[in-house]
Structures are given as structure tokens and as C-alpha cells.
Amino acid sequence: MIDIILATYNGEKFIEIQLLSLMAQSFKEWRCFIHDDGSNDKTVEIVKNICALDSRFFLIEDSVRLKNPGKNFIHTLSYSTSDFVCFCDQDDIWLESKLEKLYASICHKNNEIPQVVFSNAYCWNSEKNIIAGKATLAFPTDIESLLFLNCGIQGASAIFNKKMKEILLVPIEKLVMHDWYLTIAGCSLGQIDYLHENLMLYRQHGNNFTGSTSSSFRTKLKNFLKTNNSLIDENHFESLMSFYEVWGDKLLKNDSRKINAFIASISQSRLKRFLMILQGNWNIYGSRLKLVIKFFMRPYFGGKK
């Protein structure tokens, strides 16, 4: 059994087709727990109609309002009891083999330890009806390939086991996003692997954003050359500090050393920061060179502008 965790908010334009794509999955042994965060449109009405059609959908009506998508996902996750879990975004469309392939990729692993397997997606411009490119261009599987990204894997592309769920249900004070928590937990407290397949349509519109997404060469170059954003985003850094406060004593010594070096670099000289990058295996998008270029082009630490 796989539990699908769906956090909704004002998703009336997209939610129905996403729920129908879940119903069309070739893997049938699933349940979907849905929690709405106070929508003022027809999202809840649409969900209730689907629940009446398929008993595998469960709308959680507990009057809890988080006003934060990451916290909403983690709250909804607390209702899961199955061995495996998938997050689900309200505005994507899952290809029919998504659950089947993700389950096949994780079920034979050592599930006595926390496990995550993530996949990719097709970028979909629903307004122009264009499908092109991969949604994810970064594939972090360790601390040094994650921390400078200022994002995590695409949470809705992943499957994880009960051991990982137990980690995610331990609260951290500054939670930037649920999928960042999933990523850093996989990189430091368990095992995280990439399945080289596109298993859903990632809808691109003005209200969503996924770090490290594919686009035209001109757009990618423009984003890469931006100098008004810092190399280390303040919100992700605060989330890292909160994570380390809770889980620091459970990390391997090598990972703990890397996180400590990363945290300490905020207050160090430019030279020491640069030497840290060169002495380790720090990278973005699998490339140290790209990280070095950004290092010299951007402020080191701060918020996004």
C-alpha cells in the first residue's frame, strides 16, 4: 500500500484533473489523504465530489489551518500508516505508470533504513499546451551537492518509506519546504537515489516554482547570471540550522563536519569561503565550476530579491 499525501489551497483550476490522473494509475493499491489549508474557491467541493466516486480518497476535515504549504504537507503526512508514501502537488498530472515504477524502485531496497527515490517530470505549459524539457536539472544525493542549491528535489516526484516518514514528522522550527526536509534527510540520515524517468507533467504557471527547472537556453543563462540573489539563501540557511539543532547528533561525523563548515562559512572571510569550496566536493548541478562562477558573481549570503 502507498499513501499519497496531497495538500491543497485554492486549486480549483487544476485539482480535478490531477485527482483523475491518480485514479488512472496502473498501480491500484493506494490511498490519498487530502488536507485543505483554508481555500476560498471550489477546491473542497471538487475534492468531495471525487471522494464520492472513489473510496481511496480521504478528505481530512480537522479545522487545522497552517497557512504554509510545507507545514500543510507535513501535517497531512501524520495521517499516513502505510509502508510507502508519495507527496502529490495539486496542479500536476501523473503519468499512469508513476506509482508502479516508483514502487518497483524502492520495494527491494533495505527499508530498515530511511529511503527516498525521486524521479523527473516533463515541463508542461498548460496555457500554450507545450510539453518540453525536464522539470529537474539537479540531482542531489549528498550534502555537498545539496546545500548550495537553495532548494531540494521535487517532492511530488519522490517515494519514501516509513522510516523516512518518521523523520519528517519530527518538527523543525524553520521549515522552508517539505521537499527540502525530505531531501536533506535523505542525503544525511538515510539513502536517496534518482530514477532516470519522467513520470509526471509539471505544470508551469505563475503560482508555482521549482528550483533547478529546465527552460530555454536564454532563460537558463539569464537566471544563472543573476547577481541580485545571494549564493546562500537566508531562508534555506535558517532551515538548515533548525535541522542541525534537531538531528545534528544523529549524523555521520563526515556529514556533520561538512554542515558545520558550511554554517561557519557565513562569518568567514571571502578567501576562507573559497578554500572551503575548493577543498571539498561542493558543487551545484554536479559542477564545481558552476559553483565557483556563482561564488564570484553573487553576494554570499542573504535573501532573494
Residue ranges of model-derived segments:
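Nucleotide-sugar donor-binding/catalytic module of glycosyltransferases
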Residues: 1-215
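C-terminal subregions of glycosyltransferases and related glycan-biosynthesis enzymes
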Residues: 175, 181, 203-305
